[in-house]
A protein has these predicted regions:
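Conserved short histidine dyad/triad with adjacent acidic residue
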Residues: 22, 36-52
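Short, surface-exposed secondary-structure edge patches
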Residues: 38, 57, 72-74
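Short, conserved beta-strand element in jelly-roll/cupin
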Residues: 40-42, 52-67
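Conserved catalytic-core motifs of eukaryotic protein kinase domains, centered on the activation segment
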Residues: 51, 71, 95
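Short acidic-glycine-tyrosine-enriched beta hairpin
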Residues: 71-86
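Ligand-binding loop in jelly-roll beta-barrel domains
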Residues: 86-101
Length: 101
């Protein structure tokens, strides 16, 4: 974890910024039991289908995400969360607009 963010109130919107035609990530906590990573997806960008050996929570903090879990598409908007179950294939896309999570 970056020392500059410990024990401070942070503006979650400013932890990661959009960049044209790419996905930007910032890992803020990395522990043996899990990580906390912020992402900014430009429109049209995403993460291809994959799975993980643990549950993962996505909280959309700006925009709107299309998240596919085991073939079922979900639209998740700013202020909403979704839990992606362990070992289930999932993918994330910025279809209609950029988003941060």
């Amino acid at each position: 974890m970056s020392e500059d963010i410990k024990a401070k109130a942070l503006d979650i919107q400013k932890l990661v910024e959009y960049q044209d035609d790419t996905v930007v990530s910032r890992e803020v906590i990395k522990k043996e039991l899990g990580t906390v990573t912020f992402f900014a997806f430009d429109q049209g960008q995403g993460l291809s289908e994959h799975s993980a050996p643990f549950d993962a929570m996505v909280q959309v903090i700006d925009g709107e995400a299309e998240i596919t879990i085991s073939g079922e598409k979900h639209t998740v908007k700013a202020g909403e969360i979704i839990i992606m179950p362990a070992n289930e294939p999932h993918a994330l896309q910025a279809v209609n607009c950029p988003y941060k999570m």
